[in-house]
């Protein structure tokens, strides 16, 4: 049998507005993670174009995509990807030591409420605290865009709300552009704008008249 082509995204057209908090909502397999990977320069589309502030990334070299990710994009994933043998501060310094114009690693940890835990190792921290270290690491290089892929997916409700509160705080304090993907419809209420995906397509887009705080979310 021959190879079977699987289309992950179909006719997707999306503009992320500077300074907004965008939630991309969809079930597993809807294409939202693929879209986020393309937006972050981790993958390139087989057709269509991707641009960032007027610069075409569609046919960029690996070196240019690496530079784009390193300078302009902060990533937060469902699993924290922090190094167990390093303290919270040392994990954040992995980024600040190579970034062009980073904030101080201690400042990043203070922004996420871990000023008293910065010398702790991951094994001494809860799941929510480890995710906050991951957020601090992502924002420490002062990215133009923060991309969050199911940041509460491995957390219970109360811990998830705390992590969303940190993301909301970072969004407001740094005037950051945030795109957060989730399968959790309750999280959509904290967004400026919501994109719903199904089977690789955008099926709905709307703007929230008022945004809820993470503490007001129910799921």
Protein language model annotation of sequence segments:
Residues 201-219:
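Conserved beta-strand-loop-alpha-helix hinge in the C-terminal portion
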